[in-house]
Each structure stands twice: as C-alpha cells, then as structure tokens.
C-alpha cells in the first residue's frame, strides 16, 4: 500500500501513502533531519509506534483487507494523506517525550477522532481554502487538533500558532 517511486499518488491508485510521506512522518516522530540516520532502538521504536497507530486506525485496516478502497479513503479522510500522517508523527514525538509511560494507551484515542475532511476542525486547519494544505503551519495546526483530542496541553509555541486558525 506504499507508492515507492513517485512523490504523489494518482486518484485511481490502490496505494495509500508515498514512501516520501512515511519517511517525513517518521523523521517528525523521531525528531530527525533528512540527513540523520536511525539507531536500531529508534527503528524499533518507530516500528512499534506505527504498528500501534495502524491498530487504532480502523479505516487503514479496512483498506488492507480491501473492504474499502484507498481512493475512497483519500477522497473522504484526512488520515489517508501525507499531511495527516505527518501530523500523527509530530503527535507521536510529543507523546514519546511527554508521556513516555502512557503513549501506547494514548494512541487508542485516535479511533475516536473524526478524520473526515468535512470535519470543521480540518477545514480550518488543514484545508483553509477547500483543499488540503501541506504547509508546515497546516501540519502543526493539524497536530494541535490531535493533541487537543488526546488532552495533551499545547506548548507556548503551539498556543501562538493556534491564533492562525481560521475561526
């Protein structure tokens, strides 16, 4: 379900994510730059994190089982796009740093998030002009909404960024 060669996915593709978006989200999760390498421990941690995210994303599981098309997920849901994946990676970074003992349990709350693109929260943060925005600000604002859904206090920087949310 990963597009290995291209940096975007065509409308009719059966792929869910690009390799590039997975790499970006994992770098955000581990706080790494594009030139950094991963230790064996970091690789294991990232693998565990993404496996637990998958277990808490019923739509992704349905796509793997071919109970829903990836095209439909991309049309209707934020979590089926790189911007959503990247925001989940950023959320994971916060969880790993601030909740090292409970982050696994916290991920269960991902199931209760309304990931539909029509959710007004995403319209204001990730889709300010009616289409997905992949800007750094949009990714961070999306992550802020995830933090709020998981009852994670926003940092001072996050709070300042919240002032940019379209009301």
Predicted feature descriptions by range:
Residues 1-167:
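Accessory terminal alpha-helical modules
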């Amino acid at each position: 379900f990963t597009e290995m060669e291209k940096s975007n996915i065509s409308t009719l593709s059966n792929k869910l994510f690009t390799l590039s978006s997975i790499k970006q989200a994992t770098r955000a999760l581990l706080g790494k730059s594009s030139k950094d390498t991963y230790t064996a421990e970091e690789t294991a941690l990232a693998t565990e994190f993404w496996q637990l995210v998958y277990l808490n994303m019923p739509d992704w599981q349905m796509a793997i089982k071919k109970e829903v098309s990836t095209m439909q997920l991309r049309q209707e849901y934020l979590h089926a796009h790189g911007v959503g994946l990247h925001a989940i990676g950023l959320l994971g970074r916060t969880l790993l740093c601030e909740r090292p003992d409970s982050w696994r349990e916290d991920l269960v709350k991902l199931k209760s998030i309304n990931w539909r693109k029509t959710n007004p929260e995403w319209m204001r943060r990730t889709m300010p002009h009616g289409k997905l925005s992949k800007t750094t600000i949009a990714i961070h604002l999306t992550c802020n909404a995830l933090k709020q859904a998981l009852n994670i206090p926003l940092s001072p920087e996050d709070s300042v960024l919240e002032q940019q949310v379209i009301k």
